[in-house]
């Protein structure tokens, strides 16, 4: 849609959007005042977003203002611009005001102007940067590290050894009161679905610590071996957070399993991790439905299960003979209630959590988090999302995925409060919780935002306490995120992209930089990015271009092992070198724009991201090839829509005979969807089907899916190639 420039907009243009005459007249007067008083489009947009726009105005008017303001501006429209005074009060701003000249010398100017230089400093001076951040986070070591980074000279571990010699316990760091907080600070605010008109529940640091200690004592009473793997397959609620911290405090290793998994998927993860026990819930309550969870754990032939009731104090079904109810489990340590549990301090490289890639029919990668990974999560939150004491951080997620543990560490280590809604995040009850819990940092994924906008489920709720949004999981859409910003009076969206194997992000945004929608403004602190050209050579720094993203191998908190795979082969083998260092593979296609922003373009290999779940093309093709006898072969392609947003699944079909050249593609699409959802994942959906006389192939007969992706992106999803 073509938008008028701001000075061309008339009262009738505004009225055409459904705004009354009187209101339209006032809006136009205010707009004219702003235009006359501003010199640049960003300055104009700042004033419009502060003085004119509010959530009750039609979104079409927000779009008229945004696109009208930046008409003829070019790419990368700034949707949010930092205020220098506010920027100086952020975590990084305060640090730079105090020590900027020490770090950057005469090049230091102010937190906003010097942030990019500070990011580069964090890469070139890891000893100084990470020691500073660990001090800012008040990280407690029972034995301090000999140094920050011990680089590898053998070539076996290109990422080097971080914090060598250090001993610590991440859970202890979550539960310690110090200069960042007091024992009476509220550290969890939560609400159960169905109790939406009741006050928000709260838990203080003192209460959380007491309950974690009790659960850790009860774990010790089970008599498990040291450093046993213990699974958690539960919704993200207060009990699961207590359990997670207790496992880590006791020196065991959490095995993260998503509460949506089938018995087969649960079983696979239990076997890979060699879990000795599992915490689960009897059922998951969503509205008037009770979804079985313990039953799936039993069908997975799980080891000893400790079962938490979803409601009340007793489970809804009979347990297996050796399984324990939550109450009976805690009862084993009833005499130790209120007694401190002395944390099990472990080496920095010891495992604390086993997480998994989102494998479907293939075996998922088992990725161990060490005791350093939680520090990376907390440091990212400190720097990029500016999480501080007094913040309430909410992020709809699950302990089965990395953002669950991330939320625990990002909030508690930074002295903030977690906001947990035990229910669906898609409807108005979650929006009400955000209001009532006074959430200040709200994490989202684009598909949730799309649902909110389409259902108007946030209408009428006050989100003015929000300071910033975080977004992860999949590519976002510009207009959907413009709408999201408008719900909170144009607070920024910080895009956050990394991976389970990173422990956080490698690319993000910052509250010290202008933020463009659906774009990243900076490499994460301590990370250096490379965009590779067609010959796998890094393009010049700061040059615009598109290519596969590679990473500097030295990343604090990143993985160095896989339980069921060759880590070097997966992440380093075959990668180019830069200044004598082999680069780390990530696998996404990224664009660096002429203005220095980054945009994600999906997977560079034959993997795609569907609704935040990575899946291989071959897995989908195997299903589609057997759907109909007329199909010779298929290619599954993830294609980003023209307006941005999550990849859409397109199936390119080659038929066995020319007589099938005009089939009913809608019927075929329904068949593909039915089989894919049955055999792979109920959340996967085919967006369109296209026909081809043959698939493009390399000289070695490999399907060139990247070529198909480029053609589909250029011609549109419904074209016949």
Curated annotation (Swiss-Prot):
Pfam families: AMP-binding, AMP-binding_C
Localization in the cell: Peroxisome
Gene knockout outcome: No visible phenotype under normal growth conditions.
A GO-annotated cellular component: peroxisome
GO biological process, alphabetically ordered: fatty acid metabolic process
Keyword Ribosomal protein included in the entry's annotation: no
Ranges spanned by the short sequence motif Microbody targeting signal, renumbered to the chain: 719-721
InterPro entries tied to this protein: AMP-bd_C, AMP-bd_C_sf, AMP-binding_CS, AMP-dep_synth/lig_dom, ANL_N_sf
Keywords: Fatty acid metabolism, Ligase, Lipid metabolism, Peroxisome
Coiled coil, from the record: none
EC number: 6.2.1.-
Function: May act as an acid--thiol ligase that activates carboxylic acids by forming acyl-CoAs.
Database matches in PANTHER family: ACYL-ACTIVATING ENZYME 17, PEROXISOMAL-RELATED
Protein name stated in the entry: Probable acyl-activating enzyme 17, peroxisomal
Organism: Arabidopsis thaliana (Mouse-ear cress)
Taxonomic classification: Eukaryota, Viridiplantae, Streptophyta, Embryophyta, Tracheophyta
């Amino acid at each position: 849609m073509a938008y008028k420039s701001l000075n061309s907009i008339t009262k009738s243009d505004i009225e055409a959007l459904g705004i009354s005459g009187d209101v339209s007249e006032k809006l136009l007067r205010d707009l004219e005042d702003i235009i006359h008083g501003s010199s640049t489009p960003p300055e104009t947009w700042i004033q419009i977003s502060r003085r004119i726009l509010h959530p009750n105005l039609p979104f079409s008017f927000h779009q008229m203002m945004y696109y009208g303001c930046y008409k003829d501006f070019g790419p990368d429209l700034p949707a949010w611009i930092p205020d220098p005074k506010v920027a100086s009060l952020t975590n990084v701003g305060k640090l730079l005001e105090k020590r900027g000249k020490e770090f950057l010398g005469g090049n230091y100017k102010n937190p906003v102007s010097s942030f990019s230089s500070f990011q580069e400093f964090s890469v070139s001076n890891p000893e100084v940067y990470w020691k500073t951040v660990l001090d800012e986070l008040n990280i407690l070591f029972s034995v301090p590290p000999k140094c920050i980074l011990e680089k590898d000279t053998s070539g076996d571990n290109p990422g080097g050894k971080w914090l060598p010699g250090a001993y610590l316990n991440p859970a202890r760091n979550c539960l310690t009161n110090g200069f960042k907080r007091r024992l009476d600070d509220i550290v969890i605010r939560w609400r159960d679905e169905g109790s939406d008109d009741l006050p928000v529940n709260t838990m203080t640091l003192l209460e959380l610590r007491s309950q974690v200690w009790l659960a850790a004592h009860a774990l010790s009473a089970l008599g498990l071996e040291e450093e046993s793997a213990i699974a958690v397959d539960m919704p993200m609620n207060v009990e699961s957070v207590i359990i997670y911290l207790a496992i880590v405090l006791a020196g065991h290793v959490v095995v993260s399993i998503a509460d949506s998994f089938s018995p087969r998927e649960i079983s696979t993860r239990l076997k890979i991790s060699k879990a000795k026990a599992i915490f689960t819930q009897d059922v998951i309550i969503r509205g008037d439905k009770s979804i079985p969870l313990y039953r799936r754990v039993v069908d997975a032939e799980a080891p000893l299960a400790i079962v938490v009731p979803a409601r009340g104090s007793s489970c809804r079904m009979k347990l297996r003979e050796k399984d324990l109810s939550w109450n009976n489990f805690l009862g084993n340590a009833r005499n130790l209630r209120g007694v401190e549990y002395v944390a099990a301090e472990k080496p920095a490289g010891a495992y604390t959590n086993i997480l998994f890639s989102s494998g479907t029919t293939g075996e998922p990668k088992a990725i161990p988090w060490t005791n350093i990974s939680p520090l990376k999560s907390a440091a990212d939150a400190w720097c990029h999302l500016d999480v501080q004491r007094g913040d309430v951080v909410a992020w709809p997620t699950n302990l089965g995925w990395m953002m669950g543990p991330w939320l625990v560490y990002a909030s508690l280590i930074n002295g903030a409060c977690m906001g947990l809604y035990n229910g669906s995040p898609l409807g108005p009850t979650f929006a009400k919780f955000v209001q009532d819990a006074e959430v200040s940092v709200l994490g989202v994924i684009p598909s949730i935002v799309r649902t909110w906008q389409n259902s108007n489920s946030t209408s009428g709720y006050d989100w003015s306490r929000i300071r910033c949004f975080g977004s992860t999981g999949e590519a976002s859409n510009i207009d959907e995120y413009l709408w999201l910003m408008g719900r909170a009076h144009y607070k920024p969206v910080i895009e956050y992209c990394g991976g389970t194997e990173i422990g956080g992000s490698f690319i993000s945004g910052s509250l010290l930089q202008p933020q463009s929608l659906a774009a990243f403004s900076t490499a994460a602190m301590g990370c250096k990015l490379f965009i590779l050209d067609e010959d796998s050579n890094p393009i010049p720094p700061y040059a615009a271009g598109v290519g596969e993203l590679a990473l500097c191998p030295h990343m604090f908190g990143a993985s160095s092992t896989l339980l069921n795979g060759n880590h070097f082969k997966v992440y380093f083998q075959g990668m180019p070198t830069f200044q004598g260092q082999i680069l780390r593979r990530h696998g996404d296609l990224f664009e660096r724009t002429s203005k220095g922003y980054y945009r994600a373009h999906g997977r560079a290999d034959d993997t795609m991201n569907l609704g935040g779940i990575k899946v291989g093309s071959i897995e989908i093709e195997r299903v589609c090839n057997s759907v109909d006898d007329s199909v010779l072969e298929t290619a599954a392609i993830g294609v980003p829509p023209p307006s941005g947003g999550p990849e859409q699944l397109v199936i390119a079909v080659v038929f066995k005979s020319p007589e099938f050249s005009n089939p009913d593609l809608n019927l075929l699409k329904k068949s593909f969807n039915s089989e894919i959802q049955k055999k792979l994942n109920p959340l996967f959906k085919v967006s369109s089907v296209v026909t081809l006389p043959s698939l493009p192939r390399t000289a070695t007969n490999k399907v060139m899916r990247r070529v198909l992706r480029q053609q589909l992106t250029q011609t549109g999803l419904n074209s016949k190639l």
